[in-house]
From Swiss-Prot:
Keyword Cell inner membrane among record annotations: no
Organism: Drosophila melanogaster
Domain Kinesin motor: 87-479
UniProt-listed GO biological process terms: embryonic cleavage; female meiosis chromosome segregation; gamma-tubulin complex localization; male meiotic nuclear division; meiotic spindle midzone assembly; meiotic spindle organization; metaphase/anaphase transition of mitotic cell cycle; microtubule nucleation
Positions of the UniProt region annotated as Disordered: 28-68, 596-628
Main location: cytoplasm
Acidic residues compositional bias, start-end: 44-58
Modification type Phosphoserine: residues: 607, 612
Binding site for ATP: 169-176
Record function comment: Required during female meiosis for bipolar spindle formation in the absence of the centrosomes and chromosome homolog segregation. Also has roles in male meiosis and mitotic divisions of the early embryo.
Identification of the protein by name: Kinesin-like protein subito
A family per Pfam: Kinesin
Coiled coil start-end: 509-612
């Protein structure tokens, strides 16, 4: 009887060291603190809330809406604007599928995803439990690219703050589509480029006078500016022609958004773009100018080095290209896409095998001499994969290992960042363990804004992979950073314009100085116009002389050739006429000789004595007719 009762008691799952769990990037099996600390006293908890041992955000976001979170952050900002603490925004996007699984349910507030697997799509009993994952916002399959941009990216560009935007998810879940879109539905990168150049339409400077070099803004001399323009021209010549495609995208974007132009005459804006790829923990420049090679074959790519200097992280030797329009930036983006590494797997026919980071740096120069920098990083992270499901081997297996390793390090960094605010002796964020985290350490350390767009395919066969992705996102949602400081630099000299310094004397008339400066600049403009006209006239006269000399030389050559041809034809005609005359003369002489012989025969006397044998022959005398 006792043995029967013991057998009916369910056994607790015992973790085995012989058959370990599948390694992944999630942190759901790490130990949890038993003691909980109440952060907000004003939030009323429901009596129905139940905390789970294995859920990261099961009840923390179940009854809390996004409006309450925003209200708390606004109150904190009003209390102390210098020490504002905010966390990264984490968005969830569900890919449209034909038969969506019922294991994924979105709450009415559209900020909590409830997962509960009721089929045999997972081998772990813990994964079958109902879990609640909180997000800043959740986009279902009906939400388009316009709403995603307006929610995730548009406000940050209008606020002119540095931001890193990452797309994370499994292979084939729509990460690249969210960033780039297609020919009809533009992604967030084309929309962001169009938004940036519309905002600064009247202030975009046409010459590369400032550049971000090794994390610092540097003034470029004329020869350096000319070199940057040559690099820009070479790369644009290599880019595909997308004029018609850009016009279609522009029409779509203009129809979806009403971007406004900022009117500012005191600021000059320069835009630089760069594109980098992290493949097998090696950093490659996707906008590098290909070297000239004598032999045929693939050109080996150069591995770049990530360097940190005084808190600034940069890639040594990375090509940064100066652009003046959204079309130029989009052409460079397409060029980098063609050079990035793609391969086919059993999950995705065109799977990205590397992490790609497209950066847009905006440098603004104020007439007071202060420059500000705004950087927008768009990171297309490679999809996390399970080797058993993808069936990779060889090179694909090596790529999958490196991808999962870098994503695991990213998860460790996010986990460490989330515990920094909770513990006094927190672990150091291990951003040096991966090239990806080294490049994104500014966002991981809270120096820049961080936004993550998590993409999920709501199907039962991807349930375990989606749980790993959701657990990864829940770690990022718990991070709290202080408000980043806007980067400002001061330059001693600028080539945009020479501003007159304000008089240090008391009572100095600054308006009078500006008027004098305006008059001086107008006179300088007139002088430049006069010099330009004079140079054009001299150049025109020089060209006229060169053209006249060239045409005269051509005419003389043609005349000489014509005279030579006429001489040859005349000589040939003369020879032909002489030959005809000589032949005709010989013929006439022969005829004359023949006639003379006949005359001699007729005048011969012996011919008179010849008597005809015919008696009837007439005996009339022969008459000799003279030609005369």
């Amino acid at each position: 009887m006792d043995s029967k009762e013991v057998s009916e008691v369910p056994r607790r799952e015992v973790r085995s060291f012989l058959m370990a769990r599948d390694p992944s990037i999630d942190r759901r099996f790490r130990p949890r603190p038993n003691k909980k600390m109440r952060l907000f006293d004003n939030i009323q908890e429901s009596e129905e809330e139940s905390f789970s041992e294995y859920s990261d955000t099961e009840s923390e976001y179940k009854y809390q809406s996004s409006e309450a979170t925003e209200g708390a952050s606004c109150a904190t900002s009003a209390a102390d604007s210098s020490n504002v603490e905010t966390g990264p925004q984490v968005f969830l996007r569900l890919r449209p599928v034909k038969d969506a699984s019922k294991a994924y349910i979105v709450s009415e507030e559209a900020n909590v995803l409830i997962t509960s697997c009721k089929v045999d799509s997972t081998s772990n009993n813990v994964n079958r439990m109902e879990k609640h994952f909180g997000f800043t916002s959740i986009f279902d399959s009906t939400v388009g690219q316009r709403d995603i941009y307006d929610t995730c990216v548009g406000p940050k560009i209008m606020e002119e703050e540095c931001v890193t935007i990452m797309t994370y998810g499994t292979s084939g879940s729509g990460k690249t589509y969210t960033l780039l879109g297609d020919d009809v539905r533009a992604g967030i990168i084309p929309r962001a480029l169009e938004n940036i150049f519309t905002i600064y339409q009247d202030t975009v400077f046409r010459s590369p006078k400032l550049k971000l070099i090794n994390g610092s803004i540097v003034f470029l001399q004329d020869d350096a500016s000319l070199k940057e323009l040559q690099i820009r021209k070479k790369l644009l010549d290599l880019c595909p022609d997308i004029s018609a495609h850009h016009q279609r995208l522009k029409q779509v974007i203009d129809g979806d958004h009403m971007f406004e132009t900022k009117a500012s005459t005191d600021v000059s804006v320069l835009v630089w773009v760069s594109f980098v790829e992290i493949y097998n923990e090696l950093v490659y420049d996707l906008l590098a100018i290909p070297p000239k090679q004598d032999k045929l074959g693939e050109v080996p790519r150069k591995n770049l080095k990530i360097v940190g200097n005084k808190g600034h992280v940069f890639i040594k030797g990375l090509t940064s290209v100066f652009v003046t329009s959204s079309e130029e930036a989009l052409r460079l983006l397409r060029l980098g896409q063609q050079r990035s590494t793609y391969a086919s797997t059993s999950v995705n026919a065109n799977s990205s095998r590397s992490h790609c980071v497209f950066t847009v740096d905006i440098l603004k120069y104020n007439r007071s001499g202060i420059t500000t920098q705004s950087s927008y990083k768009f990171c297309d992270l490679a999809g996390s994969e399970r080797v058993n499901n993808t069936g990779t081997s060889g090179l694909r297996l090596k790529e999958a290992k490196n991808i999962n390793t870098s994503l695991m390090v990213l998860g460790r960094c996010l986990d460490a960042a989330s515990t920094v605010q909770k513990k006094k002796n927190a672990d150091i964020i291990p951003y040096r363990d991966s090239k990806l985290t080294m490049l994104l350490q500014a966002a991981l350390l809270g120096k820049e804004k961080l936004a993550m767009i998590v993409t999920v395919t709501p199907l039962d066969k991807y349930y375990e992979e989606n749980l790993n992705v959701l657990n990864f996102a829940s770690i990022a949602k718990n991070i709290i950073f202080k408000e980043p400081v806007i980067k400002q630099h001061r330059v001693s000299y600028c080539g945009f314009m020479e501003f007159s310094k304000m008089s240090t004397c008391e009572g100095g008339d600054y308006t009078k100085e500006l008027e004098d400066e305006n008059v001086r600049l107008q006179l300088e403009i007139e002088q430049l116009k006069y010099d330009h006209v004079l140079q054009m006239q001299l150049l025109e006269e020089k060209l006229r002389r060169e053209l006249t000399a060239t045409y005269q030389e051509i005419i003389q050559n043609n005349k000489k050739q014509y005279e030579d041809e006429c001489e040859k034809k005349l000589l040939i005609a003369q020879r032909e006429s002489e030959f005809m005359l000589s032949s005709q003369r010989r013929r006439y002489e022969e005829q004359i000789e023949d006639l003379k012989d006949e005359i001699e025969e007729l005048k011969n006397p012996a011919s008179d004595t010849d008597i005809s044998d015919d008696p009837n022959e007439s005996k009339s005398p022969i008459e000799i007719l003279d030609d005369d």
